[in-house]
Amino acid sequence: MAAAVGGLTTCFARPTPEFIAPSTSYSAPVRVFFKPFKVRDLCCAGEVVGVLSARSIPISPRFELIRLVRMQPGLSALELLKTSSVNRYTKERISIVVIGLNVHTAPVELREKLAIPEAQWPPGIGELCALNHIEEAAVLSTCNRIEIYVVALSQHRGVKEVTEWMSKRSGIPISELCKHRVLLYNTDATQHLFEVSAGLDSLVLGEGQILAQVKHVVKTGQGVAGFDRKISGLFKHAITVGKRVRTETNISSGSFSVSSAAVELAQKKLPESSYATAKVMVVGAGKMGKLVIKHLVAKGCRKMVVVNRTQDSVDAVEELKDVEIIYKPLSKILACASEADVIFTCTASKTPLFTKEHVAMLPPAGTETGRRLFVDISVPRNVEQRVSDLETVSVFNVDDLKEVVAANKEDRLKKVQEAQSIIGEEINKFEAWRDSLETVPTIKKFRAYVERIRAAELDKCLSKMGEDIPKKKKVAINDLSLGIANKLLHGPIQHLRCDGNDSRTLDEILQNMHAINRMFDLETDLSVLEEKIRAKVERGQK
């Protein structure tokens, strides 16, 4: 590490017995201390000028110096530490990370606090990308999961920042989040999203609604700053995987959904003698509500009350042809509930629609037992948790659907292996595409470098030949120079390609990239990462 003190450049290094004296192009003499460097050492009672590049000095492999970063005037030593590769976390490759909670890892009591309505997905992406180590982001929030997908400039720092963001937003302590969270990186994160899209990670194996929700993430993210190339590419590929798995394995044939499982659960919990005469009420006529109505009709229900904010959504339900649907506005919810035996709730309300005090005042249900049945598949829940304390009701939420799903799951487990094979193939394709992005800046700058040389030499040649050169000859000379440049570029660029169709590993390709960066001084390597983090730090100080 180098700092200027009275014309003397001082280098700090970690202790090592070996050292080859550096020969530098700096005009100032170099002094080397064999001691650990700390933030206070960066100040050295003088202005910090940067960090000395190990590439420019012949050194022992065990002598550690850090690469040069040209700093803006006025940055403090701490800011230098944040924005340079002295920070060990910035030496990592940019990572895809998923952080979240789902039905397998956390109870609904936690998930509902973290739930993010669709309207808040775009501003949520903006908040996440404003964090120092987050470059891109996406939000997937359903009744069964709340997952944040990010492109992190540093795994460790990125995870810390996103976890703190989730804690601040939900009011859940970080320690509690860490007990229940899903935390996956790169290939594992990619595989997880592909399994989610294929319906393999759903409460109901193979259910189709999750694919529509993944599609909605892409639709909502279009044009949102922060939903950029890597994250959008990941989600678009996940949609391809979801479609392919369903087409090639038929894993969704005859499949349950959360809505169908809710209807079946209600059927199981009702006394057999009351099933045919039970009065049914559905609260909400959105996607989930319409599916509940559809499955009620499939089970033989021909009359129900639907409570919703507007009547248009109720009228749009296709299953209305042979069914008597009685629409009631939301203001009549308690009056309708007093006459209902089974109540399904499936709205996006952030606050409970039924409290303990409300339900306690309702008359007994008309079933054999007199108990009113609530099936709440909303997250956040529409039925307050305290309602289950009442002896006159039975309350079930989305987590209680597991017992219904278990029997259905066995029939499709054989298809999971086929689906995993497809997912494995698609992971390889996606990672080849993602890895190819690593070398794109180098390829572009290398082409531009060669083009500048070609154009300059062409101008010299044409000027020497005089102004009276026939146009045909000029075109021929230009084409010749282009041909030579392209043939010279072909070999190196082929060794920078990462399309998954050759035997070169990513490490080999990255080594080739670093070599070309060094040879032609393209500076597209770690400096890109450093610039991104530095820019975020500086924006945060304004």
UniProtKB/Swiss-Prot annotation:
> Record's Gene Ontology CC terms?
chloroplast
Q: Per its UniProt record, what Pfam families does this chain match? A: GlutR_dimer (PF00745), GlutR_N (PF05201), Shikimate_DH (PF01488)
User: Sorted alphabetically, which CDD domains does this protein's record hold?
Assistant: NAD_bind_Glutamyl_tRNA_reduct
Q: Which UniProt keywords apply?
A: Chlorophyll biosynthesis, Chloroplast, NADP, Oxidoreductase, Plastid, Porphyrin biosynthesis, Transit peptide
Provide the residue positions that the database annotates as binding NADP(+): 284-289
* Positions with a binding annotation for substrate: 142-145, 202, 207-209, 213
Name its cellular compartments. Answer: Plastid, Chloroplast
| Broad enzyme group | oxidoreductase
Which pathway is this protein assigned to? Porphyrin-containing compound metabolism; protoporphyrin-IX biosynthesis; 5-aminolevulinate from L-glutamyl-tRNA(Glu): step 1/2
InterPro entries xrefs: 4pyrrol_synth_GluRdtase (IPR000343), 4pyrrol_synth_GluRdtase_dimer (IPR015896), 4pyrrol_synth_GluRdtase_N (IPR015895), GluRdtase_CS (IPR018214), GluRdtase_dimer_dom_sf (IPR036453), GluRdtase_N_sf (IPR036343), NAD(P)-bd_dom_sf (IPR036291), Shikm_DH/Glu-tRNA_Rdtase (IPR006151)
Q: Which reaction does it catalyse?
A: (S)-4-amino-5-oxopentanoate + tRNA(Glu) + NADP(+) = L-glutamyl-tRNA(Glu) + NADPH + H(+)
One Gene Ontology BP term is:
chlorophyll biosynthetic process
Which residues carry the site feature described as Important for activity? 192
Tissue distribution of the protein? Found in all tissues examined.
Recorded GO terms, molecular function? glutamyl-tRNA reductase activity; NADP binding
Q: What is its main location?
A: plastid
Q: Where does the record place the catalytic residues?
A: 143 (nucleophile)
What is the E.C. number? Answer: 1.2.1.70
Q: What else is known?
A: During catalysis, the active site Cys acts as a nucleophile attacking the alpha-carbonyl group of tRNA-bound glutamate with the formation of a thioester intermediate between enzyme and glutamate, and the concomitant release of tRNA(Glu). The thioester intermediate is finally reduced by direct hydride transfer from NADPH, to form the product GSA.
Name the family the entry cites. Belongs to the glutamyl-tRNA reductase family.
The record's function comment reads: Catalyzes the NADPH-dependent reduction of glutamyl-tRNA(Glu) to glutamate 1-semialdehyde (GSA).
This protein's name: Glutamyl-tRNA reductase 2, chloroplastic
* Source species of the chain: Cucumis sativus
The gene from which this protein is expressed is HEMA2
